Each structure stands twice: as structure tokens, then as C-alpha cells.
Amino acid sequence: MATRGRGRGVSTNPRGASLVGRRGRGGGPVAVPLHGPASANGKTGRPVNISPHVTTVGVKRPNFGTAGRPLEVFANSFETSLPDSIIHHYDVVIHPDEKTLPAKLNMRLIEFLQKNVALGMFTPPAVYDGRKNLFAIRALPFPGGAESHDFTFTFGDDTGHPPKDFTVRLTKVAEVNPETLQRFIVGKQSHDNHVLTAITALNVVVRMQPSLTYPCNTRSFFTPREVSAIGGGIELWRGYFQSVRPGIERCFINVDISTGAMFRGGTLIELALDVLGRRPNDVMFLSSKNGIPVREVLRLQRQIAGVRVITDVPGAPPKTRTVKKLTTRGASQLMFMKNDQQISVAQYFQSLGIKLMYPDLICVQVGNGAIIPFELCRVPPGQLMRKQVPADKTDKVVEFATQPPQQRMRAIQDGRAVLAYGQSEYVRAFGLDVNTEQGLVKVNARVLTPPKLQYGKGSKQATIQPKDGAWNMIDKKFYLAQTIQEWVVVNFENRFNDASIEELIKGFVSACRQVGMVIPDRPAYKVPKANGQASISKQLDDAREQCKRAKGKNPTLIIVVLPENGNDMYTEIKFWGDIQNGIPTQCLKAKKCTRATSQYYANVCLKVNVKIGGINTIPEASSVTALTDPHHPTVVFGADVVHPAPGTEGRPSFTSVVGNVDSNNAKYIATARVQTGRQEIIEDLDDMAKHILVLAMDYRKQREGKPPGAAAPKRIIFFRDGVSEGQFKAVLEQELPLLKKACKDLGIDAKITMIIVAKRHHQRFFPKDQRDGDRRSGNCPAGTVIDSDIAHPTEFDFYLQSHGGLLGTSRPAHYSVLYDENNFTADSLQSLSFALCHLYARSTRSVSIPAPVYYADIVCARAKTHYDPAQRFDSSESAGDSEEQPASLDAFKRDFKALHGAQARRMYFSGTKFQPVT
């Protein structure tokens, strides 16, 4: 594999320290200055102990950070020992294999094999992942010393189906030496397949017992100890996530609280009525004679297809079946031929001695095609939903999952009884000693000093330093406050009367002037009550034309008042403003405008000012020298990909790239594209990056007066969101060359740093002393950073909790440095990242990830606003299989409209984040 980076033998970094054998990423000697660079607090960062021969996927850790005040925290992990013996790895093939068997059935087959078929061979017991991998702590004694063996046996379970013959073939594929993992955590072993397999084996060991006992997914299991019914046929079960994670010189099991969405147990009638939002006694709503609408049947079918039901027929054992689809007619109306005579489903069951109580109710069709009345089916509890939770239930899921830090920590510690590592025969067999007696591990953290922020002329305090991740706009003016020359108000909420509109106008004008914006006393035109018969775009056209007739120009801004359920209207408004006309729009919910406070309108101004070209605040240069060095002009990118929801086929993924155009890293622009569904690599990254870079250089020349030679960036910092650890290599091999190509095509000679920012992980931190926590939430304070103990043994990474946290337990962002030509120290990169978390324009609180990454997330989520709502393209265009997908993708790309040229240079995305297209 080709080595990436500058590939020099000897070079000099910008600070003048000599580098030996420097390469931009793993695959060669580490980028360690011979004389350690100074950290932000003037100290030399603590050195690391990594053997020179060790290779990595990303950048080797250059040093440990030292900046900030020390803080001791608990991490939600338990320390574990490693096995002393060789682990034997076997491939598993189960026949018959005409279809993929459920993992749960596979687990039961292997359990039956070990305990009933070949007990002597599996002593001590082996562990199995439910698919292809089985691990044993001693070599399985196959006859004749063979490497492979077939076990044939008959297996019957409690589903009511006849016993079947199965053949399990086990083939030895490797021996896993845990010593490789021990060498890895002390920095003497590369992160290779041997290490990955060892980690995989240990994860299978700790998950084996819960997988056999409880409902589970890949990494979590769920217990019925804490259940909440939220409607829609859904129950939420509290559970536990667990994952073996190598740390620095120690190995841990990361344990967290998780939430599983289950189908409600009980009768199928009860489940169906709950899904449809009907009362429990409204059984006849499911009657075809009463005329249950077909759309409701289809809605119910979408939700419960795939559910396992147990059929209770007198005189026969209960039988487990899977719902395939629903009928639109009742059992009394569904006819079929039996003994050359046409009878109904209801008559057939009556011939078996079963008189249906509800013969007119619709029926289910199960996997083998049989039709079964609803009343004969019950739903066993503990069935995980594989579909996305409906949007109207999301708030209840969040409420159930949200726990204050001390409560979450107690729940994890209380979960030791359920995890029961000491009682697991599998954990004991493999010699793991999980130290749960000592409780959660203690970790050394630091709290970084926040950056200073600079506001505009006329501010009583132009430079401020946030405290606890927050500040306010009292007596402050925007750094660059814009002028609203003309504006229009359009009201789409009938109950929002003229007096309410006048309150809105007064409150908004006052708030604008408080922060230094210039605005006329009155809007040029207002629509007190929109015409319910006319289209939204037509009414916005009329409002714009009225403004032009009255003032001779288009409005600078249109404020739109929406009803509470106005999400579809929002999409049409944004298409009109951002795509068709290039006029900024600000949508406000009528409910929030009613008797709104001055604080509410101040928050609206934060969004509006940047939408029309302003800058709210900038980082004060001396407090973030790593970001604002004038000798190294910088463009900071944020990039993201959003994929279609589970269960949707033929839908594309949407990509976004955001970058700053100004020298202060406060003014951002964005571009979005369409690509093949579920593809993580951004295939158009070169063109998207060029779009940002061209406009950045143009802005710096025209607006900042920079000479052409000084307008081009000398540093590029690329933050990438949404990439799993298994995709790091692909990002390096595919996206990094595209970013370099963009620079080369534009003649830009910039040093690149590429960083993955991850939020989908389960690492949490809790202050050891509650007095050190955030005063309101009890979380670790904003700026808490950890790059030791539970961090990666060899690669440059850190956890940064940059926000104060309001509800629940804050989740830190995990930063992994994949490529670094800028030779950042741990302190400088941590400080830079923390500073960027304070530049999210629509907030006076630091956010959980750097602002450009947050913006990229929003741009992806708003991708549906690039489609003409009149075509209903997002809901009508759906390919049914992979052969249709290319045509569907072409259609999605063709109908994806580019931003209006005026909006392409503005922060049009500084607004509410709506759900992505699904």
C-alpha cells in the first residue's frame, strides 16, 4: 500500500523543530519533533512511549496534552485482564443454508451443539457471535486431529414447528494470541488483523451470556426490569451496551445504558390498535365491514411486518409465525377452495371448532402464505423493532433515554448484577477478570481555558470569555451587524391575529437594534393572514412583488409565521427562498411568538444576522493562535454524509461540505450533493472543496483586501463527521486524494490536517467530585478533555466535552487525527477544536462539536429543501430493488436543484435543523 504524506526523509516543521522520517500518517516513522514543541501553557507535552516499528491507520500520537487545570473523572468502563491462553478461531457454516438463519436461532443451535450433542468436545464452552465466528480457549479435539468437522443433529424448539436436521461445520481458521493485544496496549504492536481479531474474540466472550438470555442487538442487550409504553405499538426497554476497548497500557470494558424499542407484547389486536392510535376497546375499527381505510391497513402493515406472533389454535400446540402482510378484507369475506368447495377463512376455522368472535376483522398473512385471524395471534414480548421509530415518538424516546449524570453512573454500577461477569461460565472459561468491585475507572482529565470572543463597536464589553460554556448578548453588538433594508412578514397561522403580528414586529425591531443591526420601524409589507386557497410559493411571490412596488427592491428578509405542524410548509418556503429566489427567510412558530420575550427575539437575531451576511462574533486572535495565525491563513472544513432511513430502498445519500471564507473562521458557506445510497465516502469531494476554496479566496481578496498571494490558505483543517473506525482507511485512501486534487487544481499549496469527529460512541465521563461538575446539570465542565488512560494506545486521538450540557449526561466528541501535515501538538489541536465549538452563530453557548461540523450536519438534514415540493419527488420516487437504483439515483440527481447564487455566499443554513429526507 502506498504511503501517504509528504514522504520526506528530513524536514522542518513550522516551529523550526527538526523531524526525522516524517510522514503524514501511519505506515512510517512517527511525527515527533526531536525537541518537543511547546504546548499552549508553555510546558512541553508529555512524551509517549510507542515503538518506532509500530504502524497505525491514522497519525501516531505526538505527545499528551498538558494545558488546562487537572480534573479527576470517572469513565463508564471497568478494567479487565486479558486471557493467558491461546484462543482458537473457527469458521461456522450451518446447513440448510437456503436462507440466512436468524442470529438468535444460530445461537441456540450452537448452544444445543455444545451442551447436548458434543458436550465433551466443548469443555470449557466456546463462544459464538451468531454468524460466522466461534472462539474456543482450547483447540477442539476433532476426530483424527482434523482442522474441520461436521456435526449433524436434529433440533426442535418451542416455536411449534417440527424438529429439523441441521449440520454445523466448524473449520479452524486461526489461533489468536492475546499477547498481541497486550503488546498493542503498551505501544509495541501495530493495529493489525491479529489485534482486531483478539478484540473481536473478547467482545464475543462478554456478550455470549446476555445474548442467550435477553433480547439483544449487536452490542446491547435489554431487560424487562424497566419498561415504558409510549404508544404506537412501542415499548422502550432499558438495557446495557458493552464493548471491549483497548486503552493505554490497560484494557477496559466500556459499559453504558442503552434503550431498545420493542413491539408491545400482548394480543395482536392490542398491538394493532395501539399502532393506529385507537382506544383498546375500539376493536371494530379493524373490521373490513366497518370500512377501515386501506391507507390505515397499509400504515399498520408497514409497522408490524416482520413481527413474530404465536398462533393459539385449540387442539394444536402454539406455533410461532412471522407476519408478512395484512389483508384488506375480513375472515368472513376471504374465500378459498377446499374439497372443491369455496369457503371463507371464518368458516374454515369454524370447521376446526373455533368460532371467531370478530369474523369481520382483517387478517394477517404469515411467512408460508397462510391467512390467520387477528384474534388467534399474540405477540411475545421482547421483540426488537428493526425499523426507525416514528418521528412523533422521538421525543418520548429521548425522554426515556435521558438520565442526569449521577443517575446514569448509578445505573451503570447497579448493572453489575445483570452483567454478572463473575457468574458467566464463558467469561470464567476464557480467564477474564473484570474488576467491577473497584467500580468505574478513574481517569485523569483536564479542563481547557475557553477562547476569548470579540464583539463589535459599541459593545460595553467588546471582548468576553465564556464561563461554563455560556455567555450572553447583554450590552453587546454583533461584530459585523447587517442592515435590513426592507422586510416582509407573511403569516400562515390563522389564529395568530393582527395584534400578535404587531407584537412580533415590535419585538423583532427592538432586538435587532439592541445588537447593532439597522432595520426600518415597519416591514415594507405584511400579510396578516395568508390565503388558504393559494399555494405558499404564490403568496411569497405576491409578498415580494408588493415590496418591490412599494420600495423598488426585493426584501432583504422575509419573516414567515408558521403553525405548529408546519414542517411541510417549511420545506416549500426554503425551496422558494434558498433555491428559486435567493431571498433569506426566517420561519417562526406562532406558538413561540405569542407573548415572546426579548430573549426569544435576541436568539432570532443571531440567526438572521448571519443569514443576511453578518458576523456575530469572532475568536479573539491572541487566545487561539493555533487557529488565527496570520502567517498561516486557514480554511476549516466540516463534512458529513446522511443516509436514508433503515428499511428504505432506492433512496440516495446526501453529502455536505462547509468551510469558512473569512480569516476569522466565523463566516461559513456550504455546498450539498446527492450520491449513491448508503455510500459513506464523499465522491464529489474535490468539486465541493473547490467551490468553498474559490469563494474563500474571492472573499479574502474583495472583502478583506488581501493580495492574491495572501488570499489562498496555507493550512486546511478538515473535520469529517459520521465515519466509523472501520472506515478510517477508506477516508484516507479515497477522500484525502480528492482534497489534495482540489488544492492542486486551484494552485493552492496548503498543508492538510484531517480529523474524524465522532459522536456515536458510548464513552461518558462523570466528575469524581460533584463540586467540580457543571452547576446546573452535574456534568463535567465545558472544556473537559481526556487523551490518556481510555484513549487509543498508539494513535492521535482525544475526547473533548466542549459543551456545558443542559439535560441528561453529556456525550463528549471523539477526535481521531488521520493525517497531519501541520504537525499539531495535542494541546494546540485540542485548543483549536475547543475554540471552534464557540463559533456556532445561532447560540451563545459552546456546542458539542466544532461549528463547521455542526453546520455540515444541518446542511445534510436540509437536503430535501433542494427538491421542488410541487413534484412531491421525495415521497414518490422510490426504487424497489438494486436494478432500479441507478435510474432512481439519476432522477434524484437531476431534480436536486442548486442553491441560488446569492444564497451560495450566505450562511443560509443557520436555522432550525429538520429531519433528513427518508
Regions found by a protein language model. Give the residues of each.
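Long, low-complexity, intrinsically disordered terminal regions
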Residues: 2-918
